[in-house]
Amino acid sequence: MEALVYTFLLVSTLGIIFFAIFFREPPKISTKK
């Protein structure tokens, strides 16, 4: 059970970071273009 919680936490953190970068980059590129 502990391993599952740790895995979920790791995936959640990675997902949030990837989502933030993916959402923050397009607007910049669009504005620059």
Curated annotation (Swiss-Prot):
Protein topology in the membrane: Single-pass membrane protein
Chief location category: plastid
N-formylmethionine sites (modified residues): 1
Stored HAMAP family: PSII_PsbT
Protein known as: Photosystem II reaction center protein T
Cellular component per GO, a single term: photosystem II reaction center
The species this protein was found in: Spinacia oleracea (Spinach)
Family recorded in the similarity comment: Belongs to the PsbT family.
InterPro entries found in the cross-reference section: PSII_PsbT (IPR001743), PSII_PsbT_sf (IPR037268)
Gene Ontology biological process: photosynthesis
Gene name linked to the record: psbT
Keywords: Chloroplast, Formylation, Membrane, Photosynthesis, Photosystem II, Plastid, Thylakoid, Transmembrane, Transmembrane helix
Job description of the protein: Found at the monomer-monomer interface of the photosystem II (PS II) dimer, plays a role in assembly and dimerization of PSII. PSII is a light-driven water plastoquinone oxidoreductase, using light energy to abstract electrons from H(2)O, generating a proton gradient subsequently used for ATP formation.
